[in-house]
């Protein structure tokens, strides 16, 4: 292929879709469970079917695909199972909003079956978009194994797991204080609650002691829950109140008398040392209520309003009830005061609503019997967590784990497989078969199924099993690919998801779900804001923001900050938009280069441009090589390479490539994606293109060596290109595959065996239909000279000296140089000359025994080797004139500053810093002048 058959710039548009269709249509992504190859499986963290992919999805799936492509090329039977998540709360909320916006109807306007039908329609549409986006990113998933967390297989798995845990007593139903979302009207697990610090008040309220003139004052942050108080608690050791133990106080508004109790949990230093106990609406109070056998009075409706137990305040919002209760207490003389107080408020991670501790009957997984195994899997390295510092987080969380609330008051999700007898709710049936239990079928009017659904994380916790066919095992996938190799996910769902997979999967099959866990950081984008005319912060978007993202200097009124991606902050980066603008390879390299081992990934917009340029560098580097190997065929490579014709630069690049493979193997093992990207990037750009190719260009163009030398370089270029593109392929699959197919077409079919240690593996790679199924590059078996690195380092210093002289003399960077060399006795630089000439821009080099006296030159010395660069006469005249002008300027400056510093008046009146500055200027000017005088003398 001639060089001009290539476009001058890499344009991924059109190429990417065609390549992906070729890969998928050829079945290259499909795993074979009957294969003899060692298994390597990853299950995709399923994106929610709520919309489109965001940059976090692009990151996690790029990292997985890099591993999958690397392992597939490394000879493993790779199985990457894609899938999507039904995402109970999130999807139901999105669909409810959609139906209200499009039809003006709320969920309660539909039957359960009608609403679920709408959700399935949403799922089909959204899932199709998501899967298309994954293909655009280049994800080499096994699409024949696509899963969904609400498909029939997943439902069978969920029911089987629920019943297995229920039968063993690990799942129970009971009243408990749950995290209640009054907007979504469902319970949430502890780790679905986010906490914020807010400004609030501490209210002081009088309680009148029954049959006494005494009173007791308590401090509370929530006066509205007074309606549900069932005791006042004090420390038994608090002498101020000990005489009141056993007495009762009158509870206003609801006409109840409640006891004063002693409890060691009360802090005598908080408030007045006396606290109100509301067991149905506070976790600490709940435990106190259990310990003292107190009644539990729920005063809230599921909507968050005051219920019938609130008496005259029933039907009010809790905020309005608080306001009215304080007003009424003031009128009764029972309100004392309020003080500012910092509150730690729980909010729903989905709706943003303030969470209410709420007494409710729910289903729970008892975690106590699993705590030891959860701990041991990680403590004994059966499951390794990367980065390892998150191991401590995991173990701490397991040690403090509480029972997991798994029931949700939703319509969308896996229905809890339990039926209740209408006349006796304690008579229940747990059933994991198809349809309904036989007993229910025989008497359907006497039974009803639990209306609640399971927490999304319950079905997601079984994901590694269901992805591989469990509870059906006929396919052989479970036996072949379980446990999976690694789970890649964000560190923010270590507890939401990772721990629950370990719990549920090990409980079902007595084996861990994966061997490694890699937790990536969360993506942050740069936001910019300024004060508006009202004195409020406003975020900057559009073209102005993009200009700042690309490096435009910030005005003084603009503040930049790395923040979590948010539409309101204007710092969201759409991965599909970036793919359209920069290409999938550039997006993938950007994400891999940022996948550090910290908690935060600062996604710099300029990286997309940088890696787009690198994809173009790959293209143009290959374009140059193709222009010089068009005469080669695969037979030339089969004949091999004569190692006696290899030069210093050849050994150096081959050894460098072998070292690169070792470093990459280590980086892959530790999931150091940023290092993988950087090492491959720097080797291709610096070692291969900027150094090796530049050194051999004179040979390729016939200016150095003979035809045999040229053919050797051409063969080695082809071998290196196949191998280096193979290294880059897992990260940049599209541009490398395009070039691989062109290379196959150029060299022709490989139809003969090859024993040459340099070319053999490259030919094996070229036999493959695609890089996707080609063997990964291997270290090239060649004896490396012992003094290679010392010799190359000396050659680099010689080149550096030549370049330094060029710069000091201000010679044209493109001008060819005439150079002489004087070597100490017994030292030869013959081996280095090709490299020196190519990288130093040397047109002629002669060996002398002493420095010439008839020409002007500039001299450098490296380890006793003298290098002289002759200065052209036309440059001498031009440079002498420039130096004379600079000499005059410096002499005038020296005279002026010297006169100023010699003035006693100046020194007496001037700021000492100014005097020191002038002295420094004088010193520097004198040094510069001496340098110029030396250069002028060298022209004499």
UniProtKB/Swiss-Prot annotation:
Keywords for this protein: Aminoacyl-tRNA synthetase, ATP-binding, Coiled coil, Cytoplasm, Ligase, Nucleotide-binding, Protein biosynthesis
Subcellular location: Cytoplasm
Molecular function, one GO term: valine-tRNA ligase activity
HAMAP family for the chain: Val_tRNA_synth_type1 (MF_02004)
PANTHER family documented for this protein: VALINE--TRNA LIGASE, CHLOROPLASTIC_MITOCHONDRIAL 2, VALYL-TRNA SYNTHETASES
Domains: entry comment: ValRS has two distinct active sites: one for aminoacylation and one for editing. The misactivated threonine is translocated from the active site to the editing site.
Protein name: Valine--tRNA ligase
Binding partners and assembly: Monomer.
One of the Pfam families matching this protein, by short name: Val_tRNA-synt_C
Primary subcellular site in the record, as a coarse category: cytoplasm
Protein's job: Catalyzes the attachment of valine to tRNA(Val). As ValRS can inadvertently accommodate and process structurally similar amino acids such as threonine, to avoid such errors, it has a 'posttransfer' editing activity that hydrolyzes mischarged Thr-tRNA(Val) in a tRNA-dependent manner.
Highest taxon of source: Bacteria
Reaction(s) the record says it catalyses: tRNA(Val) + L-valine + ATP = L-valyl-tRNA(Val) + AMP + diphosphate
GO biological process, alphabetically ordered: valyl-tRNA aminoacylation
Stretches assigned to coiled coil: 872-938
EC number: 6.1.1.9
Motif range ('HIGH' region): 47-57
Keyword Nucleotide-binding found: yes
Motif range ('KMSKS' region): 564-568
Organism listed in the record: Chlamydia caviae (strain ATCC VR-813 / DSM 19441 / 03DC25 / GPIC)
Protein family (similarity comment): Belongs to the class-I aminoacyl-tRNA synthetase family. ValS type 1 subfamily.
Positions contributing to ATP binding: 567
CC terms in the record's Gene Ontology section: cytosol
């Amino acid at each position: 292929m001639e060089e001009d058959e290539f476009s001058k710039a890499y344009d991924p548009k059109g190429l990417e879709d065609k390549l992906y269709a070729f890969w998928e249509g050829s079945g290259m992504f499909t795993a074979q469970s009957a294969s003899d190859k060692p298994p390597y499986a990853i299950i995709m963290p399923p994106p929610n079917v709520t919309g489109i992919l965001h940059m976090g999805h692009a990151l996690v799936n790029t990292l997985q695909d890099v591993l999958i492509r690397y392992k597939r090329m490394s000879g493993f039977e790779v199985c990457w199972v894609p899938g999507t998540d039904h995402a109970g709360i999130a999807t139901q909320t999105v669909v409810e909003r959609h139906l209200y916006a499009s039809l003006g109807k709320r969920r309660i306007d539909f039957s359960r079956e009608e609403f679920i039908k709408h959700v399935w329609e949403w799922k089909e549409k959204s899932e199709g978009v998501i899967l298309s986006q994954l293909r655009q990113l280049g994800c080499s998933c096994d699409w024949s194994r696509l899963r969904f967390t609400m498909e029939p297989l997943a439902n069978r798995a969920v029911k089987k797991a629920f019943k297995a845990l229920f039968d063993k007593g690990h799942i129970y139903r009971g009243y408990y204080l749950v995290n209640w979302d009054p907007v979504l009207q469902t319970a949430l697990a502890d780790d679905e609650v986010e906490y914020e610090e807010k400004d609030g008040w501490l209210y002081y309220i009088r309680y009148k002691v029954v049959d006494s003139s005494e009173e007791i004052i308590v401090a509370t942050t929530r006066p509205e829950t007074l309606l549900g108080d069932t005791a006042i608690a004090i420390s038994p050791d608090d002498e101020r109140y000990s005489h009141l133990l056993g007495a009762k106080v009158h509870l206003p508004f609801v006409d109840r008398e409640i006891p004063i109790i002693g409890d060691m949990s009360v802090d005598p230093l908080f408030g007045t040392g006396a606290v109100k106990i509301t067991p149905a609406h506070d976790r600490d109070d709940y435990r106190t209520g259990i310990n003292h056998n107190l009644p539990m009075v729920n005063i809230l409706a599921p909507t968050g309003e005051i219920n019938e137990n609130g008496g005259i305040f029933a039907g009010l919002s809790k905020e309005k009830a608080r306001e009215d209760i304080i007003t009424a207490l003031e009128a009764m003389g029972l309100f004392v005061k309020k003080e500012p107080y910092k509150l730690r408020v729980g909010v729903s991670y989905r709706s943003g609503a303030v969470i209410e501790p709420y007494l409710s009957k729910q289903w729970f997984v008892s975690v106590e019997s699993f705590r030891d195994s959860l701990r041991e899997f990680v403590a004994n390295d059966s499951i390794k967590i990367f980065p390892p510092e998150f191991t401590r987080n995991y173990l701490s969380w397991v040690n403090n784990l509480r029972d997991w609330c798994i029931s949700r008051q939703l319509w969308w999700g896996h229905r809890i497989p339990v039926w209740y007898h209408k006349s006796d709710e304690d008579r229940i049936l747990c059933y994991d078969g198809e349809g309904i239990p036989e007993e229910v079928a025989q008497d359907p009017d006497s039974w009803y199924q639990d209306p609640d659904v399971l927490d999304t994380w319950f079905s997601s916790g079984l994901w590694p099993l269901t992805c591989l066919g469990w509870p059906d095992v006929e396919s052989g996938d479970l036996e072949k690919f379980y446990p999976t190799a690694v789970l890649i996910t964000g560190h923010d769902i270590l507890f939401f998801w990772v721990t629950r997979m370990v719990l549920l999967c090990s409980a079902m099959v007595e084996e861990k779900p994966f061997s490694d866990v890699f937790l990536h950081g969360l993506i942050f984008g740069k936001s910019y804001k300024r004060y508006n005319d009202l004195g409020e912060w406003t975020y900057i978007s559009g073209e102005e923001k993009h200009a700042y993202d690309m490096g435009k200097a910030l005005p003084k009124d603009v503040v930049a900050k790395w923040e979590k991606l948010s539409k309101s902050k204007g710092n969201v980066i759409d991965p599909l938009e970036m793919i359209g603008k920069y290409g999938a390879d550039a997006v993938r390299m950007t994400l891999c280069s940022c996948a550090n081992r910290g908690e935060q990934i600062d996604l710099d917009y300029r990286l997309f441009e940088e890696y787009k340029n690198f994809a173009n560098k790959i293209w143009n580097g290959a374009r140059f090589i193709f222009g010089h190997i068009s005469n080669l065929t695969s037979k030339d490579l089969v004949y091999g390479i004569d190692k006696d014709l290899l030069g210093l630069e050849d050994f150096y690049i081959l050894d460098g490539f072998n070292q690169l493979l070792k470093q990459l193997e280590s980086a892959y093992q530790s999931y150091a994606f940023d290092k993988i990207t950087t090492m491959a990037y720097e080797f291709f750009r610096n070692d291969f293109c900027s150094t090796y190719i530049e050194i051999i260009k004179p040979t390729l163009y016939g200016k150095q060596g003979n035809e045999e030398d040229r053919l050797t370089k051409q063969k080695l270029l082809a071998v290196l290109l196949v191998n280096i593109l193979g290294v880059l392929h897992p990260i940049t699959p599209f541009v490398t595959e395009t070039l691989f197919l062109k290379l196959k077409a150029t060299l022709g079919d490989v139809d003969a065996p090859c024993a040459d240690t340099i070319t053999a593996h490259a030919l094996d790679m070229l036999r493959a239909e695609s890089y996707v199924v080609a063997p990964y590059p291997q270290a090239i078996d060649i004896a490396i000279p012992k003094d290679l690195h010392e010799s190359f380092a000396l050659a680099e210093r010689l080149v550096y000296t030549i370049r330094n002289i060029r710069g000091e003399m201000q010679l044209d960077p493109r001008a060819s140089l005439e150079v002489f060399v004087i070597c100490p006795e017994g030292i030869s630089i013959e081996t280095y000359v090709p490299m020196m000439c190519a990288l130093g821009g040397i047109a002629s080099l002669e060996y002398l025994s002493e420095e010439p006296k008839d020409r002007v030159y500039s001299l450098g010395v490296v380890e006793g080797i003298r290098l002289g660069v002759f200065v052209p006469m036309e440059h001498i005249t031009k440079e002498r004139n420039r130096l004379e002008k600079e000499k005059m300027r410096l002499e005038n400056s020296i005279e002026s500053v010297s006169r100023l510093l010699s003035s006693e008046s100046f020194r007496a009146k001037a700021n000492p810093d100014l005097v020191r500055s002038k002295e420094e200027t004088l010193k520097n000017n004198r040094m510069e002048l001496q340098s110029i005088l030396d250069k002028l003398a060298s022209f004499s």
